[in-house]
Amino acid sequence: MAKKITFNEDARRGLERGLNTLADTVKVTLGPRGRNVVLEKKWGAPVITNDGVTIAKEIELDDPYEKIGAELVKEVAKKTDDVAGDGTTTSVVLAQAMVREGLKNVAAGADPISLRRGIEKSVAAVSKALLTSAKEVETEAEIAACASISAGDPQIGDIIAQALEKVGKEGVVTVEESNTFGTELEITEGMRFDKGYLSAYFVTDAERQETVFENPYILICDSKISSVKDLLPVVDKVIQSGKQLLIIAEDVDGEALATLVVNKIRGIFKSVAVKAPGFGDRRKMMLQDIAVLTGGQVISEEVGLKLENATLDLLGRARKVVVSKDETTIVDGAGSSDQIAGRVSQIRKELENSDSDYDREKLQERLAKLSGGVAVIRSGAATEVELKERKHRIEDAVRNAKAAVEEGIVAGGGAALLQSGTSALKDLQLTSEEAVGRNIVRSAIEAPLRQISLNAGLEPGVVVGKVSSLPQGHGLDASTGEYVDMLSRGISDPVKVTRSALENAASIAGLFLTTEAVVAEKPEPKPAPGPADPGAGMDF
């Protein structure tokens, strides 16, 4: 297909038009007085949201150059959202400000490469200053304050703080839709996976239809168990120890399953068999996780271990095991804390190197099961539109709160970015050409506060001047129009959110400024309509 190529200033301005269209749509949502945007859907009800990345994803432009410009800025919003769970609108506002000022300087004859270098050095200095000024999040109330700002609802903030208090910063907090009104929290203790008992005869608690064992042995096997001859030696050893047995294997069937069931019914020996979670390589990894957690070993011929030769020291242990029809929970595995920490570190490295959203999600789940736990927040609403919007807000607020716990918090409302940034840039030593890049960043760090005050109906220039003269950490409470100590008022941003927004905006601004040509698809001319059928509509 033929391509359309544009060079120099025309190329950059085409990209900027797309950026501005997207940014102007997104930035109206910034701050406590930000407005909503309604998104039409091809199917179902429209969505009402004030989340920057959700709005950005929906925008598709006709002009090929504008479309490319908009897509580049979508990446800024998406990357910030992935890393920090919030700050998407801030990152778009910062990118727009940097590109606008940068293109003015390029048009006036500035060297784009020196500009980009100046921007990168300036942003690194501001990021360092933000990290230095960050305050650690130590109390549940501080976590709740961060989550409340992101979600726009103090009740949601409190629930998220409770969830993180229970599962820790490595734990998984999932958000599900509920059929009832309100928001509720459910905490899962220990490691849980979605596989239940292979026979209802294993049940020990008839009322709850669950198998509950205290201090059982846990046999972990990566192959199918059908022959009772293979299973009998290890079962005999467990019977002699007077304990119960949980068997996790690829499958347990035939005479092996029948023997276990008969022994349970006759009261000779209590056991329960479940299928291993996952598939393929992921199953092997999850079995290894269970082995590390319980202090056992995976019985696998790949490592020279056979089921018929298994001894008690190869089996895992746990304080409690609960198995229902659909899931298995292992509480307080007896694995060594050093081995668990090593496994957690290994999974975290895989997480950092993974590009796939699906793989990252599964790795995060494994990490949580090993190191923290799982909390489920169930949210309900009156309409489907409200439910989707509320669920999305809670998901963002969870990531926001985790970011706060990870790197600490700074004054919100654009105050920390302006104050820390201004002082950091003042002392930065740059060449004369790079200093122009510093001026671009200095102008851009005012942009979020300007937009927040504009959305609140205030005069941006006056607000920026006032906040610049206030002590560090003081700023504008846009919901009331007062100038206050932001952290004591509970108005804060996770430093990771502010830092990610600034760094991602600078990255895309550098690409815009150093672009000399844009190659786009040439729109195909629409075929002319064919001649009308002269006989159409006539009745013969």
From Swiss-Prot:
Xref: InterPro entries: Chaperonin_Cpn60_CS, Cpn60/GroEL, Cpn60/GroEL/TCP-1, GroEL-like_apical_dom_sf, GROEL-like_equatorial_sf, TCP-1-like_intermed_sf
Residues binding ATP, per UniProt: T29, L30, G31, P32, D86, G87, T88, T89, T90, G413, D493
EC number(s) reported in the record: 5.6.1.7
UniProt-annotated location(s): Cytoplasm
Full protein name: Chaperonin GroEL
Subunit structure: Forms a cylinder of 14 subunits composed of two heptameric rings stacked back-to-back. Interacts with the co-chaperonin GroES.
Gene, per the UniProt record: groEL
Family in the record: Belongs to the chaperonin (HSP60) family.
Species this chain originates from: Tropheryma whipplei (Whipple's bacillus)
Transmembrane stretches, start-end: none
Keywords: ATP-binding, Chaperone, Cytoplasm, Isomerase, Nucleotide-binding, Stress response
Domain of life the protein comes from: Bacteria
Disordered as annotated region, ranges: 520-540
EC supergroup of this enzyme: isomerase
